[in-house]
């Protein structure tokens, strides 16, 4: 693997004490035939999309001696246009913000609202990068726990808000690594509690921001609402999105934030100047010219997810049917009772199939690939489960 171990850092370097012994975050990047571990869209952009991107980048190359538009106004307008089309929610340019992937969006939110003495609250199990953002911004990371079916435990979450007084409440819909959707009634209850909640170390009248990470929202079932619909109703709501997943644009690193202007202005305080390159902006704008093509495989991936979930429920391990978490994403958390998921991971890898060991013990996650890749996954998993059964 290509990740560099922090344990190899020379002792004479003044690395922060809290970073000593830490490892760089990242899923394995291995050269194997079937990569189903990082929730990418497996289908490459269509030739027409590639041609437009290449042309726009060629045009912008003539101006690379100049800094880009640091407010990326044209791209923010493109975000507005896309969200109105995709979700039916009309927002203004000053309610959108872009960054280098939703990872940078989330980091900017932690920079703006976290910090020493501040607390951020998540709901376990959740995305494993959130505590990394907290660590890097000296924010204390606290957890409420989800229900056994991985749905949001609203009562436990509201009690945690009252007890720990967070500056940020981070929810994920669909949740990663489980795929569980967030019910709008549950979100409204959390937003309502946050509107009057105190923030530890802050002045009276300051209330927490609720961040909903919707990185995988385009994979939701038709008719499922999005948190974007509540932005006009709740001033304390911020919704993070990305072009990396359904939009098949992971390599370009483009994420964006939708919120009321006050939240956007807070994020603008901590952003680096000219953080989105001219090339990134040009490529993203070109991709939006081909929205239909970029999203053309989403319905098929949704069908693949549903078919794979049904198939997994028919499989057994040690005489027990596999558990499959409810999902509205492009990945599935499955297993529930694997005694040694690392063994299963290794055996699958030997057969050229790479998935993830994430989430609670006993569970594994697989993202949806092409039809050929999913056939390889099913064939390999059946063989591996048979081997494990014989142990």
Identify what each model region corresponds to.
Residues 46, 236-317, 323-324:
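PLP-dependent aminotransferase class I/II
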Residues 302, 315-351, 368:
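Conserved PLP-binding catalytic core of the aspartate aminotransferase-like
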Residues 141-144, 168-174, 209-214, 325-327, ...:
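Short beta-strands and strand-loop turn motifs
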Residues 112-133:
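Conserved PLP-anchoring active-site segment centered on the Schiff-base-forming lysine
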